[in-house]
Amino acid sequence: MKRILSFVISAFMILALLPCSAAAEQAAGQTAGEQPAEQPTEAVAGDRVVLTIADMNTRSGNRYNGEMGMWRYLAERLGVEIQYDYISPQEYSARLASGDLPDIVATDKNLSTILEYGVALNVDPYLEEYCPNILKGDARLTYDVFKQLGNEGDGFYFFPVKIGYNGVGYDNETTARGYVVRWDYYKELGYPPINNEDDFLSVLLQMHKNHPVTEEGYPTYLYGTDNFSGYDTAFRAELSVDYWAPYKYQNNIFTNEIFDGYTDPAHSMWWASMEWENKLYRAGKADGSYDMDLFTQTIEQFDAKVARGQYLGLHAEKSGLYKNKIKTDPNTLTGYNTVPTSATNFYTNVYQLLGNGPGYMWFISANSQHKEEALSLFNLMYDPDFVRELTLGRRGETWDYDAEGVPRMNEYGQEQLDAYKAGSTDPDNYFVSWGSFDKMPSNWPCLRDNSPHPDGYMVDFATVTREYEKATMSNNISKDICEHYGVELPTDAFYKAGGMDFRNDCGEAIASCMSSLNRDQLNILSKAEAILLDAQVDLILAETDEEWEAIRDEKIRQLVELGEPEVFNVYRKKWNDAAEIIVPLVREVQVRNGVTPYTPEQYADRLGPEDSAQEPEDQNSAGTEVQEP
């Protein structure tokens, strides 16, 4: 029988619980208090231990640079050398199965697999001695939730990362998700409003009519994406679901109600993506404005087209085009940006109780010979003093406390920081050589820069302010947005347009706290994924609504026959059990921090008739009936 397992995390958020079976404990070969099994060899460089780390190469590029001052400082504080490697998903799976792992390893979304292989060290007996920062301050909430959702016998296996607010409601750049357009062409059309998907398609068609080729002669295409997962449609107001939940079970970001994205197309970002891509295909097939290479091109080929401006719309903002153009035209508006509108949701004010869980976490290998050093690394990554230095430079070099105990940048540090934020690439610039929070790999550090520091200020007291964002806004498109919409910051334009953000969403925290599905259930979901993948191209290239609907109905019939709805009913019960605890905690923290959750009256127009009519008590009692598509 599966037990809920928990993970505690640092100053601002909480912990992730996962199922831990008796079989997993036996496979791990250890119980609380036992020493981890030793590896046959030990990595040592000279007088220093070599601490090995494996990250996933699917994480926003290889951002680790051991020559940066921040990483040298970390190694210096630990007294180790760091060997940081990126591995492919295939290698990751193979090494999990074999147990041949480095000291510290990244997670993927399915934490239960790691537990079942028994490759993660139960660090609970060692936290007080080697990683006390995870047990202090706001992180205590995490530990308390662990005690509430887990039980005394459960271990602690995973370290959540980037605990705190993902976005703070103001920024000098806009959200990367929504209706993304080539801004220069969009302005040329007079900034037409985009209130729904059909408006978006109309704008893209007008752009293509005006610009069938780029200035350099490359053909343009209506829309580009590097995946068909629903990363675009999830953020549209008519869906309003959390993209990051495991499987195709996504929650509404306002109510946190969970939906079956396999057999309920009305609440599925994947089915919505298929419908959207089919619209694009039928609109662009005659004149070649639908890019058929989307099915076969590599990510490098896709990025090259983005950098040349060949796509008129994108699934997410990409900076390559703007960066290319600004080199030769300091006033350029050529680049991609999201249109301010109430028709999409703004990914900000997201209080991540469990950080970027469950997909972005770490564990220490059960076979690591260097558990003390690994735990000490996490202790620093949960230390608000250390994370402040990672973010703003070493105390005494770029900043210090004044006579009243207020942290302030010194003249040199402020000068260097301002130049860096303005885009300096001078190797002599302090922050170019030191690094910065936004240059770290996407699952470091464990606290966000907007986390509270014990001194009463944010960890990043220097730049996470509205005033600093205004003063350092240098992007031409951002400035154009402010001028056109009559606002101070681009994010203001979204709220002015009636846009809403993710402040109510608890999806990632809930998913991290759930006990896992069993092997039979996971096997059904694996087959369900294969059924949908098999239909993907046929759905996108369907010539008529009738053909598209026939494919949809047949695939849903296959999914029902497979037994996927029964798996969803089990998952929904687990979800609701975790949500009952997590949602009130997140709301409490949001209110305490001055971010008032949206009321049902405020988000009523973002719920379909089925959503707003459903009574909460019906959520657990639903049978295997599948909603009509």
Q: Positions of the model-derived regions?
A:
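Extracytoplasmic/secretory soluble proteins
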Residues: I4, V8-I9, M13, L17, ...
